[in-house]
Amino acid sequence: MSRSLLVISRQAPWSGPSAREALDVVLAGGAFDLPIGLLFLDDGVFQLAAAQDAKAVQQKDLTANLQALSLFGIDDVFACSHSLAERGLTAPDSAQPLSSAQISQMIDRYDQVMTL
């Protein structure tokens, strides 16, 4: 049986390669039917914001990767409700908002945790 993996994405989408790398890891795991989850935390919640203009910052758009999560069978997508509120954002339907206490409990369910 495969060990479960939670990937925590803490970086804004255009602040460096970490956001893309987190999505790449999750999508690769999903392609191999691994039990995998994704948590957006801190500035990582900016990846969930609608209407981002990647061309304005000369970056590749991550929206398609986010939309592909469900196609790869990745249903465990979470967002820190405190991080969302601090940044004036709301979670899209594709991400379940969790409190700090819920995040702690959820992390305990995974065998391995990777933070990017």
Question: How should these model regions be labeled?
Answer:
Residues 55-83:
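A glycine-rich helix N-cap at a beta->alpha junction
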Residues 77, 113-114:
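Short, well-ordered beta-strand core segments
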Residues 110:
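An anion/phosphate-binding loop that grips the pyrophosphate of nucleotide cofactors and donors
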